[in-house]
Curated annotation (Swiss-Prot):
Residues noted as binding uracil in the record, renumbered to the chain: I193, G198, D199, A200
Family affiliation: Belongs to the UPRTase family.
Enzyme's top EC category: transferase
Cofactor entry: Mg(2+)
Functional summary from the UniProt entry: Catalyzes the conversion of uracil and 5-phospho-alpha-D-ribose 1-diphosphate (PRPP) to UMP and diphosphate.
Protein's GO biological process: UMP salvage; uracil salvage
Catalytic activity, EC: 2.4.2.9
Protein name per Swiss-Prot or TrEMBL: Uracil phosphoribosyltransferase
Reactions this protein catalyses: UMP + diphosphate = 5-phospho-alpha-D-ribose 1-diphosphate + uracil
Annotated pathway: Pyrimidine metabolism; UMP biosynthesis via salvage pathway; UMP from uracil: step 1/1
Species of provenance: Salinibacter ruber (strain DSM 13855 / M31)
Pfam families xref list: UPRTase
Gene name, Swiss-Prot/TrEMBL: upp
Key words of the record: Allosteric enzyme, Glycosyltransferase, GTP-binding, Magnesium, Nucleotide-binding, Transferase
InterPro entries: PRibTrfase_dom (IPR000836), PRTase-like (IPR029057), Upp_B (IPR034332), UPRTase/APRTase (IPR050054), Ura_phspho_trans (IPR005765)
Length: 210
């Protein structure tokens, strides 16, 4: 699919297997989400801007590189919180915003309940993270909100995407690339991704028994 990167990596495939497995306990699930997010971050940040800098090694002067643009990570709460540590692992200076959203289980439409976004968003490359891209409603709504806050440069990163969600983002935000670990088959009648991995938020935080 255009503007979609499916990251092909053996460790990511291993992690996805753990995440899909119903009997994986929430502690291991939470750690695996973070580990998988770090692999996604490696790929999602491939085109991040660098600038040269002169440094001294123990032996001589040479040229090195520093990140030239501000990096911001905005998780769609609550499940997106599980991906933050993975994304800031390589860029500890990244700013982190928070956007609280939940899905209305009758209309399947997103409802926001919290927003705290750094004021520097207009100068940052913003990585919007959420484990699941299902209908695309929450992702599109979040990006709308962040653009209203002044954001201009975005990447959306998820662990599992449905074709319907990808299509919605392509239609409503064609300027936002999607990076995912896997593109699953479809949404079911309840707007859950199949085969999917269940409710990522519940499984990360252990808030509901299987």
């Amino acid at each position: 699919m255009e503007n979609v990167t499916v990251v092909d990596h053996p460790l990511l495939k291993r992690d996805l297997t753990l995440l899909r497995r119903e009997e994986t306990p929430h502690g291991q699930f939470r750690k695996t989400v973070s580990d998988a997010a770090a692999i996604l971050a490696y790929e999602a940040m491939r085109d991040i801007e660098l600038e040269e800098t002169s440094i001294e090694t123990p032996l001589e002067q040479t040229t090195g590189y520093e990140i030239a643009e501000e990096v911001m990570v905005v998780p769609i709460m609550r499940a997106g919180l599980g991906m933050v540590d993975g994304f800031v692992r390589y860029v500890p200076e990244a700013r982190v915003g928070h956007l609280g959203m939940q899905r209305d289980e009758e209309t399947y439409r997103p409802v926001d309940y919290y927003s705290n976004i750094p004021s520097t968003i207009g100068h940052a490359h913003v990585f919007v993270v959420d484990p699941m891209l299902a209908t695309g409603g929450s992702a599109s709504f979040a990006i709308d909100h962040l653009k209203e806050e002044g954001g201009q440069d975005f990447t959306f990163a998820c662990l599992v995407a449905a074709p319907e969600g990808v299509q919605k983002l392509r239609e409503e935000h064609p300027d936002v690339p999607v990076v995912t670990a896997v593109l699953d088959r479809e949404l079911d009648d309840n707007a859950f991704i199949r085969p999917g991995l269940g409710d990522a938020g519940d499984r990360i935080f252990g808030t509901r028994e299987s």
